Amino acid sequence: MRILFVTANRVGDAVLSTGILAHLAAKYPTAEITVAAGPAAISLFRTLPNLHRLIVMEKKRYGAHWLSLWRDCVASRWDIIVDLRRSALAYCLMAGQRFIIPKAKREMHRVELLASTIGLGATPPAPTLWLENSTEDETEGGQKIAIAPAANWIGKQWSAERFAELAGRLSAPTGLFANARIAVFAAEAERDQVQALFDNLPKDSYDDLVGVGDLSDVAHLLSRCNFFVGNDSGLMHMSAALGVPTLGLFGPSRTEHYAPWGPKCGYVRTKKSYEEIVGAPGYDHRTTGSLMGGLTVDAVESAARQLVERIGTSQ
């Protein structure tokens, strides 16, 4: 049996699609699964148990990347094609079943929308990541707080200085995670965005995990953390999918669509709503700076405490 799974370019959207992929992999354990995704997200799927092939979709002018993907896939007859990009590809290939993501609904979380593609919108499978077996000694003591201070757009980016203050509070001897180490995650290309965080932390208090490896490596390191706090980003969704207690910071993005998914997740947002932020006079996403200034360190620390208390109460 052959399954073609066409998913997102962006890491966060690709992570959110892993729930339905995991469902298909479990339902058809002997299937050969081919995953097509953008270069930023493709390594998420390297450890998928049923994986047959990965196809990197490098964006090309005039949509030529779709022609390239068709050429890669046309010689096979697919039992199932799942297209989460709403392209015409599925209708140009031989397939037993075709599942195309429906149009987005305003109030539907992305996980629910993705699940509705294969008829599971009422009971959406949670995103999941597949960790490689490791021979490393993972018995090191002490707690770790994962901090992800970058974002794919400056408007969504809380200031690195505030992240540093928050990290200091959470890891203080009397903090929520007393004497925890700070694990800082970002892509290597984002180092300049997060440098101010390093500049404001004691040098012996953190692990610099910027650009540490591909996304499978990052997932392994994230899974060893006790708590995650970061902007609305792919790393936030990875942490949630790994079952790490996850607090997402939101401003100019919709929590109803992209809040971290799972029982150990929460979010805190600016006092201004998404509509108030993007509807403000003079707003232009191309030229704006950070739109997260209305979110205070006090508010984020309080949200972290509330999330930890809620998780502890529910266990």
Set out the residue ranges of the language-model regions.
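Catalytic machinery of carbohydrate-active enzymes
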Residues: 1-315
